[in-house]
């Protein structure tokens, strides 16, 4: 059914203008949409203090990069390492794990290209998705765990930030050219019946180019380093020469193999209480598979609050673009009253937003506090972001419970923190979602 826009219809729209609309039009023309829709009463009604606070450290900054998943997971690990080291503001090297993520992900991509060469058309949806998304900065909790378990960690002083680690786009652009060109070459070799050795030679030549680019942009990752430091009390310590794996094993007392991700996939066709995975998502060949336990968001909120009340931080993924304000550091449902500004009903369910591409998890952060009232209800959460100290309360944000339910999609928790019914499904065969599914959006 096709209907043109008629002059009569346009004339009726002109005739429907009123004085209230004129006021809104003038205000938006002068200040923009969000400042006019901003509900200051929500700010006043949202204190930033919480009853249970884990953090007493400074925030970090991912700068102009998409490394939120690495920063937030490292911030979780440093919350324990800092205690062992006696350094309140200790940081692991985010640049070190970025290097290994890019290198491992290049190998993961090329391996995928070879595996799909005979079954997937170049102009098919899967190959076009893989080629379009090659070597993005984003990632998932399980991908971070794969990196840390294989390559260990180093302190920031052992591999500090560079211009390219904080502004990855130019480096990524060069890497994509190498990988996309090699993908075509590898597909041609497979289709022509080339030997495994011939295919490996082309792949390893491309990986050598990737390594060269990464070393120039990020520096060479240390195979070992001498670790010595002065703690916050002024006492000097020397641990001698350590490998990254040894450093990780000595100072990270979190068993990452026992963590599982709970997600709120609101789509009716994906039942709660079952596991999910996203095909072709990962970074380390042979690494930890992506695994989610689909869980009602109310239960995710309760589990998160319980962990925070016990004094432990929680990694999570959310859609940070919804009803949020960077300057005041607020994630508050209804922070912007777009309905009254425009006279339009913008209400949609979480399921509708996911199904239409309106919402997906796009940013990972760390919960570091919760406010629990006298009845035991979690009213708001304290969030450590990785955007530096300028936003919010020196980089920390405040989230209300309604925003949590509407926009938080994922948390990573220890299996011991799960109720028995969720622990029981962790080992079941997951439902496989396609590579382009919204549940893979953070990566």
Residue ranges and their predicted role:
Residues 287-362:
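Long, positively charged binding patches that form subdomain-scale interaction surfaces
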Residues 373-443:
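Conserved catalytic-core surface of thiol
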Residues 68, 148, 355-388:
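Catalytic nucleophile-His microenvironment captured as a short glycine-rich beta-strand/loop
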Residues 71, 316-319, 368:
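Short His-Asn-centered micro-motif
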Residues 53-57, 350-352, 384:
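Short helix/strand-bridging catalytic loops that position acidic/His residues to coordinate divalent metals
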Residues 43-314, 391-394, 401:
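Active-site nucleophile-adjacent alpha helix/oxyanion-hole segment immediately C-terminal to the catalytic cysteine
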Residues 14-20, 45, 265-269, 329-333:
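Short acidic/polar alpha-helix capping motifs at helix-coil junctions
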Residues 2-57:
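N-terminal regions that are enriched for targeting/export leaders
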